[in-house]
């Protein structure tokens, strides 16, 4: 990923930290992970009028981050510790589950 400005809603960041114990400032570091993988967020709950992406990247531990692109800015929507299946996808140990994930730019 090229250098981009990272942004997020401070209130959403606070709520996210209370729920998942992941700070958005830390989550922003996943975009610097050269091994980061991503996929389009096609989850049922995604009803936004914007393209959302899911990414897995290492920041002390593997994080699962949902974000969107707004011009030259990357806006973090949510972040949490990756679950077992997502970790296997990140490490490349689950070829079947890696479907849809691709190496990030």
Which functions belong to the PLM regions below?
Residues 1-105:
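Ribonuclease/tRNase effector modules and their secretory precursors
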């Amino acid at each position: 990923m090229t250098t981009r400005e990272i942004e997020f809603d401070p209130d959403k960041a606070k709520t996210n930290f209370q729920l998942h114990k992941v700070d958005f400032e830390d989550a922003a570091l996943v975009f610097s992970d050269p091994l980061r993988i991503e996929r389009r967020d096609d989850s049922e709950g995604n009803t936004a009028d914007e393209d959302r992406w899911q990414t897995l990247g290492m920041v002390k531990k593997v994080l699962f981050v949902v974000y969107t692109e707004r011009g030259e800015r990357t806006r973090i929507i949510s972040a949490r510790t990756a679950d077992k299946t997502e970790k296997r996808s990140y490490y490349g140990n689950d070829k079947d589950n890696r479907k849809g994930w691709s190496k990030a730019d």
